[in-house]
Amino acid sequence: MDLVPLKLVTIVAESLLEKKLVEEVKRLGAKGYTIVPARGEGSRGMRSVDWEGQNIRLETIVPEEVALKILARLQEAYFPHYAVIAYVENVWVVRGEKYV
């Protein structure tokens, strides 16, 4: 069994950004993604009302060069304007050809 080193990019953002973020990560080279609801508390505190919408957690496994493109786009277009965080982890995957 061969394991392939890749990057797991995780983006936590306002749910209203879901469609736009999916389009961006795919355009930048991601072959797929997973989205789940997210909640918690950070530097902006907890949201006090539901009408503001929920957060989502978008995860995608990509080669390093794609991860860097995604992070650069987030920094340029999203971080200044929206409640968005992102982080990258090293992962080793089976069937790595599905991700490159």
Language-model segments: residues:
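Positively charged, small/polar-rich N-terminal and surface patches that mediate targeting and assembly
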Residues: M1-V100
